[in-house]
UniProtKB/Swiss-Prot annotation:
Sample GO molecular function, one term: sarcosine reductase activity
Lineage: Bacteria, Bacillati, Bacillota, Clostridia, Eubacteriales
Keywords: Oxidoreductase, Selenocysteine
Organism the protein comes from: Clostridium botulinum (strain ATCC 19397 / Type A)
Function per UniProt: In the first step of glycine, betaine and sarcosine reductases, the substrate is bound to component PB via a Schiff base intermediate. Then the PB-activated substrate is nucleophilically attacked by the selenol anion of component PA to transform it to a carboxymethylated selenoether and the respective amine. By action of component PC, acetyl phosphate is formed, leaving component PA in its oxidized state. Finally component PA becomes reduced by the thioredoxin system to start a new catalytic cycle of reductive deamination.
Protein name per the record: Glycine/sarcosine/betaine reductase complex component A
Length: 158
């Protein structure tokens, strides 16, 4: 079964990384439904934490659709910011400031530059929408951070 098939996708893009609309275009035709997409400024939020409104939206959508049906795709420009966002949607808000404080959703979460994402989307669309950013991002650092968070906190490892 594919990563996207039948999933409800929450996209949290980054103004300095990969924006939400670029990730959305990549997901078209995968069998997933994008239920929320935004583009944030990760360095603008307090200590790089996930925006409180986005935390609320993630929580509400997870309650509506079920955690097992949710897939979160991030576009953060840095590994640390991606890790904080991934930790928030899996283990709860590490800053204890938002609606996901002490809420362990365990959601599936990937970054748009990870091989698991790239392998599932149209290669031409990926190159057009994300390829240039991939060249300037610290891809290995992002992959390592995301893998560590998933291994430790994700409840739905396929």
């Amino acid at each position: 079964m594919s990563l996207f098939e039948g999933k409800k996708v929450i996209i949290i893009g980054d103004r300095d990384g990969i924006p939400g609309p670029a990730i959305e275009k990549c997901i078209e035709g995968t069998g997933a439904e994008v239920v929320f997409s935004s583009t944030e400024c990760f360095v603008u939020t307090a200590a790089g934490a996930m925006d409180l409104e986005n935390q609320k939206r993630v929580k509400t959508l997870t309650e509506k659709h079920g955690a097992e049906n949710i897939l979160v795709i991030l576009g953060a420009a840095e590994g640390e910011a991606a890790g904080l966002a991934a930790e928030t949607v899996t283990n709860g808000d590490p800053t204890f400031a938002g609606p996901l404080s002490n809420v362990q959703l365990g959601l599936r979460v990937y970054h748009a530059v990870e091989p698991e994402f790239k392998e599932e989307v149209n290669e031409e669309v990926y190159e057009e929408e994300i390829g240039m950013m991939e060249m300037v991002l610290e891809v290995d650092e992002i992959i390592e951070e995301m893998t560590d968070i998933r291994t430790e906190f994700c409840k739905f490892l396929d």
